[in-house]
């Protein structure tokens, strides 16, 4: 049975029943039939992003009572879930598909994600593909996370709690990340062998990030590296793994897709995204592709889309809320996988109260006890971060959310853009007139407590990257070109646009029915039309300043000036403007032509 997303109770129950049936039908120990096969379990997750504490994610499930919500995630519960799945599969491997660290909540990020590495060490995983966020603090810091030590590569101090920091006991894999001299930054592959009786089966793993990683991180973080084509890299490594005895090939890749298949449909209907062209060129002898990056949850039999490439394609969403279980049966005579199934399981955590009210534990979904070691580890780091995390910074009159309207504008994005403008508007601070904020830089919603208080840890969760503000002068024509790049630059397309938030006082319209270069109109700044020759001072993050998210025009501009950290600007905004109300989402208008 192939289940797309067990974030539905029916899927979770079906997964449990399937496993029970398989175990119940196992051949008696020592039988000839059993001796011909080795059963292997793969356990996978992705995009954990240092969410050590339960991330207050509510996974929707369907029941006889309608749609219910299940609280999911938390490292202590994830560790327990992994342990239970390991117990089901005597032969097992645990892997991740990248973005284990960075863009993390304060309890991990304040300590350079060392606590996340320590928690995952306790889970005893085997391999982790690198993702783009592993490079946020630079490749040298990534190597420190692997190797351990206290050498300082960032503005934050390493080894604040663990002295010394031992590093990852699992292996990061970075097959398509190569130094200028052609040497790999990290290992490309790994092999794990399983012996049963006289038979040994080897599983080969290829791990890699997406080729577009340099467009998503600071150029300084990947200086001296190149990121090669994903499919070509994997295809070149498959015969090498075969030569080393690998019977099964698993690709863990930090790239993903989207699918609109119903929860119990055993197909990949509507699958799209950047993973698809990679799959279409991938060696068909690959057995499983564990993906990530899009934060989507799916389990797909890709062979139903393209019979020539019968991969299992999986992704476990984000933040440790889901865990993927893959079951493989290998014929020891032919060395072939003769059966493979996959399921996503909800990692039910603990009840919480969010912007939509109480999310209680759900008896229809398996619950996991908190792993005591991980629970104590998280508590130790939380106590160290608590004074800073709990410091009040201001008030909000209502939740500030990333939910986007039809024009892809959000209240939280507008607020952050306004905060950047306020911090740099004065002539002595850069003289900014307009602010841009990329949606990917907003990592959490901002929900005040019952008294309306907002705390520093919440601001950090929204903007955890530590970008500096950069102010430059652009012409009106360049600003128009920037906005055009929302729909036609690299991965920014009409099908998957990346719409920037803009500050108060600026507005424009876009029409996706028009050709590229003619989609932006009616640009207005402070009540006056923006002309092509007009000069405008624009503030943005250092990430956008370096051309991040495919906004290459933003690398241009004149009279560059560097301001304060984005997080400091947001904190100052709350200090000066409290109580803060959600800004209106009426700055951007999407023009939809009338049907003929």
Regions found by a protein language model. Give the residues of each.
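Bacterial N-terminal signal peptides that target proteins for export
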Residues: 2-13
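Bacterial N-terminal signal peptides
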Residues: 12-22
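Acidic, metal/ion-coordinating pockets
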Residues: 25-353, 412-422, 435, 473, ...
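Feature captures C-terminal
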Residues: 36-41, 51, 160-191, 302-312, ...
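Acidic/histidine-rich, surface-exposed loop or edge segments in extracytoplasmic proteins
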Residues: 49-66, 392-404, 463-465, 547-555
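Generic amphipathic alpha-helical segments used as scaffolds and interaction surfaces in large
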Residues: 65, 69, 129, 225, ...
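Alpha-helix initiation and N-capping motif
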Residues: 75, 113, 139, 275, ...
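Hard-cation-handling environments
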Residues: 337-454
